[in-house]
Amino acid sequence: MNRIDLPPPAAGGVVLSWPGKAPPTFPPPKAPRLVETFEPQRLVTLQSAPPANRLYYGDNLDALVHLLDAGYAGRFRLIYADPPYDSGVEWTRKARLRTTLPRELNGVVIEQPQYSDVWSPGAYLQFIYTRLPLLRELLAEDGSLWLHCDHRRVHHLRCLLDEVFGAENYLNTITWRSQTARGAKVNAFFFPHSAHAILVYARNRAAPTRWRPQRRRIELSENEAAGLFMRDERGFFRTSDPGTYSFERLKQLHAQGRLYAPYGGEVIVDEAQRRVYASKGGNLGVKYYLTSLGDGRYQVERGVDNIWDDIPGLGTTPGEDLGYPTQKTEALLERILNAGSDAGDWVLDPFCGSGTTPAVAQKLGRRWVACDASYGAVQTTVRRLQAVCQQCSVSASDSRGDAEGRLCASPEGFAVYAFDEMRPPQESVGKIDLAITRIEGQEATIEVAVLDADIPFARSLAAVHPALDWRAAVDSIAIDPAYDGLVFRAAMADAPLHKRATVSGRYYVRAPAAPTTLAVRIVDIAGGESMTTVRIEA
């Protein structure tokens, strides 16, 4: 597959041109190699086939071509694409020690390069233009594409989408308030840029496109509610026209105290005429009461339009901050996935960055594919997904799972693939001291204790903060209880998401009967990876 035919331009339509514009062409399919998996079910049984959810490390052009070649055409109900914005910035991830030290003593240890958003004239538009036809082919007939961008290129990207998807398949533009201007930005020249745009297109609007209206909950004080709603002895309420309600249904609503008569009138039920009406004229209304939250607070539900100012950006959601630039909040992706997909649907994110889309898809029961060309992004996504998978696998009565040494059933995990020409950075040179103990009476259970990790960042840490141990320099620990020497198949991971939380260092995992090779991999805060293996004979 070298080319994909685009729809013919509409009569009188607008076609965007730029220096070096060329028809989209694609490389031949390449076979990615399986790099690692996270399979919590391996705590119970070994699986031969890797999980269906997959993360690709490499150029997403190769990944998209591979997906089409592998039979994924028309499979994805929803595609969320958050490409570079042509911002002119070399983006980095800021890494800090995992410690409760005061912030002034715990500055940024390293800035890890993530991706370049600097483009030559015409290169940015050609980059996007080449990938859009592939996304269209992967999208289900009733699916939707959500392309996230900002003020710099939104006008150009809409023209490209019209050209590739057809202007008739344009659905809407979502305006998301991504930040609240503070400090000097408040007085920015011709107003601050506080919003992003999300362009929404259908594969075939006539299909029709999968769509589920969204609602949002709004909290009001008693004074706010009094200014917006009517009130009776039961509380604040709004009214709605009863429409075609039957006589019996109106009688039922009246018995429940849910009919409203205007002008101070009363509700009259005329059995002989089989009608319900207001004594002083006017139209009856059906009462819908606000939910009382106590303490003088009330909650009301309202429909969501295309102005999303109720979902905060990362700046006001610090608990989600992974230190990754351009990270999006989970609430944003929850709304998008809930609006355009159902549980069990396939979701694709070709620019996954910090992994918000696959993390939310995992929580919502969607199947997913994600891609990124930055190894730092892949590491961040893997760590995030490991934590999500283990959280999903633990019952409410055992909510902390393996970090406390408890075994639990798990959902499907995920697999990581890489294209041959894009290999991870060389593993950092380090020594991991382990203590392995089989639990008496539970021969299949192994206690793994990480006693020390002599990794480069831990050595640097000891020189600056002697009181801190190696855990402050570690982002995650993963364990493969049956390592085959080829693919690291983690059965459990300790991947704390809170920026100051540290790994436990003591774990219980199930392992197959001896002999087996147990592998432990540590990823430090700078992205360095160290692994050690232990052969268990009995």
What are these regions (language model features)?
Residues 134, 139-145, 343-344, 364:
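Short glycine-dipeptide loop
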